[in-house]
């Protein structure tokens, strides 16, 4: 279903987008798509400080563009006064490529000249200072996961199935929104969002050691990973 936003360069438009993203990670669906790119290109970065949800989403999409690009199709989105995003987003080209033409005019500049004694001494001092500082604890990354949980048959109590799934507690695991999706022949599956701390939770182990063992396997037949995105 297509989504429409008013002028995102105005406070009213940003207020509307901020409220929309309160319970969503992406503009449409459960993974980054062209819809996110359309809105991303219309949002003025300098105005995000007052909009917590827009700022969170903007930084996430910006990181995806730098790392791997965005190619999801999306459901369609319209931003008043803004042109649609290109078909497939790719990571930004390196600065060296963007300035290749200018380099032709700088043949007389020695870009790779030898370091002076002063530069070497300064580099050594910086290295010594860095070595003297205590190592900072590396922050663990997080991922957003969309999981399909399938029952045994149409007689499975889906309410109890969801209660069983939500009873799973593990450090670094946060369960989010869920919904029942018809599969066919009267059978429904549970689709549930979750956020995991990468260093603490393995989705494969979560499925094998928690969701498909007793007593939960009384309701759960199998689980499939539908989407997995770094946050």
Curated annotation (Swiss-Prot):
List cellular component terms (GO): cytosol; eukaryotic translation elongation factor 1 complex
Instruction: Enumerate the residue ranges of region (Disordered).
Output: 75-136
| CDD domains named among the record's database cross-references | EF1B
Known role: EF-1-beta and EF-1-beta' stimulate the exchange of GDP bound to EF-1-alpha to GTP.
UniProt feature, compositional bias: Acidic residues: 101-117
Q: What is this protein called?
A: Elongation factor 1-delta
GO MF assignments? guanyl-nucleotide exchange factor activity; translation elongation factor activity
- Locate the compositionally biased regions of type Basic and acidic residues: 118-127
What are the boundaries of the signal sequence? none
Family, similarity comment: Belongs to the EF-1-beta/EF-1-delta family.
Subunit info here reads: EF-1 is composed of 4 subunits: alpha, beta (1B-alpha=beta'), delta (1B-beta), and gamma (1B-gamma).
Q: Which keywords fit this entry according to its UniProt record? A: Elongation factor, Protein biosynthesis
One Pfam family name is EF1_GNE
The cross-references to Gene3D superfamilies, in alphabetical order and at most eight, read: 1.20.1050.130, 3.30.70.60
Q: Which SMART domains match?
A: EF1_GNE (SM00888)
């Amino acid at each position: 279903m297509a989504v429409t936003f008013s002028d995102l360069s105005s406070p009213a438009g940003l207020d509307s987008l901020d409220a929309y993203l309160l319970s969503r990670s992406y503009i449409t669906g459960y993974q980054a798509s062209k819809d996110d790119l359309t809105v991303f290109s219309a949002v003025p970065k300098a105005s995000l400080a007052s909009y917590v949800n827009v700022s969170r989403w903007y930084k996430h999409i910006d990181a995806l563009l730098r790392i791997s690009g965005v190619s999801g199709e999306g459901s369609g989105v319209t931003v008043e006064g803004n042109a649609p995003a290109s078909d497939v987003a790719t990571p930004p080209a390196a600065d060296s490529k963007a300035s290749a033409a200018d380099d032709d005019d700088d043949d007389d500049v020695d870009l790779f000249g030898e370091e002076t004694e002063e530069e070497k001494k300064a580099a050594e001092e910086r290295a010594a200072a860095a070595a003297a500082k205590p190592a900072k604890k590396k922050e663990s990354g997080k991922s957003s996961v969309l999981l399909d949980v399938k029952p045994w048959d149409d007689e499975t109590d889906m309410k109890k199935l969801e209660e069983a799934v939500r009873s799973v507690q593990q450090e670094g695991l946060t369960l989010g929104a869920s919904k029942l999706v018809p599969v066919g022949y009267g059978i429904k599956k549970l689709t549930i969002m979750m956020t995991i701390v990468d260093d603490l939770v393995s989705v494969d182990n979560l499925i094998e050691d928690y969701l498909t063992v007793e007593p939960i396997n009384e309701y759960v037949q199998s689980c499939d990973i539908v989407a997995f995105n770094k946050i």
